[in-house]
């Protein structure tokens, strides 16, 4: 999902240029409901996000569960939505049931901008059967319930043994 028309066009051209066949792209924002939202239009595209002030480009908002994704299993989901993770996950209950691993950056101040604490995401993922880890290089460490960080990349994993065997990561205790 890439929202601004400019970035979506770049993505579509990149897919065509690289002759990728098994890729579907959707020019929508993901969230907890089907509606519309405003998306910021900052010069630096990597800083754009759902606007809380109703300024920017108006775009369609839909639940991930409502996209035409016909997979029986998702090995890895990458989510990077600058604090909107909680709402994406709320609209992805079915998809998360078939997802084995999620990679997401957590920036507490981004979560706070949308009125929730990053631990809300952790609780939601744990309730869906995920174990949470920080990682560095080829090492992962379990996240304790009192986790506190300014910025951290997180792995949410359902089958730890399978993940370790597949990736050759090491669990650091």
Task: Locate each region found by the language model.
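Phosphate/nucleotide-binding beta-alpha loop and adjacent structural elements of enzyme active sites
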Residues: 1-173
């Amino acid at each position: 999902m890439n929202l601004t028309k400019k970035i979506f066009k770049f993505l579509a051209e990149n897919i065509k240029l690289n002759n990728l066949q098994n890729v579907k792209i959707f020019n929508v924002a993901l969230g907890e409901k089907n509606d519309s939202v405003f998306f910021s239009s900052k010069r630096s595209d990597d800083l754009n996000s759902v606007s809380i002030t109703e300024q920017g480009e108006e775009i369609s908002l839909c639940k991930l569960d409502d996209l035409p994704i016909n997979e029986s299993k998702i090995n890895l989901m990458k989510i990077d939505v600058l604090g909107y993770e909680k709402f994406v996950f709320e609209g992805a209950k079915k998809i998360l049931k078939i997802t084995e691993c999620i990679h997401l950056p957590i920036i507490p101040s981004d979560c706070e901008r949308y009125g929730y604490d990053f631990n809300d995401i952790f609780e939601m993922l744990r309730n869906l059967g995920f174990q949470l880890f920080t990682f560095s290089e080829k090492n992962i460490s379990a996240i304790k319930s009192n986790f506190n960080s300014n910025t951290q990349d997180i792995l949410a994993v359902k089958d730890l043994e399978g993940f370790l065997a597949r990736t050759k990561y090491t669990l650091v205790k």
